[in-house]
């Protein structure tokens, strides 16, 4: 038999709701009660007037003392929390005793807590371990239980072990100025416009300054084309001169023959 404490709902015409609490840690924990089911361990959803219960209306703080749990109630609401028909000051903690009557929200229309929708009895009990399936599990495991919680994959989901991940550096694709793709591995490479071999960049020195090797001189295609044309002109130019000089020689010979025949 393990020590636990309970909240038994006895008011509002819906009695019989029972909440059993057994903190999982001996250091204690906190249980939230309110209309926000995503923030509280016990959801108090009013059916008559929704505005009577705050998002986090109150908190139960449990601390282990000897063989039993010491439980105190703290109010965080705007409509109030009553213990034995006495309103608890907001932000004030009150230690509960076995048999105390708790009212969350204002009193009922008749002016008594018994007519309230959320009217509970607090009691200290001992529960067998086989009955722990009905115990309310707290969202907060302790006073300092809030904080980052890692997101874990669901059970049975395939997981890749970290040992299979490759430690080799990943390749990087860079688009250079002339529109070609360069694949870089451990050492970055650059490509010249003339189609030569890739030129490697020097490894940075210890002072963090990179020494870049001078790029090869670019070729001036236009200049080389003019040079070729000039050479062609030199080769072709003697041809027409020889053609023109040959008729002149023949003309002189014919003229000399006519002069000789005229004489």
UniProtKB/Swiss-Prot annotation:
Main location: nucleus
Miscellaneous comment text of the record: This sequence is very similar to other orthologs but it lacks the PHD-type zinc finger domain which may be important for the trans-activation function.
Cellular compartments annotated: Nucleus
Residue span, FHA domain: 31-88
Listed Pfam families: FHA (PF00498)
Biological source species: Mus musculus
Alphabetized PANTHER family for the sequence: TRANSCRIPTION FACTOR 19
Chain intervals for the UniProt region annotation (Disordered): 140-164, 189-225
Record flagged with keyword Nucleus: yes
Biological function: Potential transcription factor that may play a role in the regulation of genes involved in cell cycle G1/S transition. May bind to regulatory elements of genes, including the promoter of the transcription factor FOXO1.
Keyword annotations: Nucleus, Phosphoprotein
Entry-annotated residues carrying Phosphoserine: 78
Superkingdom per UniProt: Eukaryota
This protein's GO CC annotations: nucleus
Example of a GO biological process term: type B pancreatic cell proliferation
Protein name, as recorded: Transcription factor 19-like protein
SUPFAM superfamilies: SMAD/FHA domain
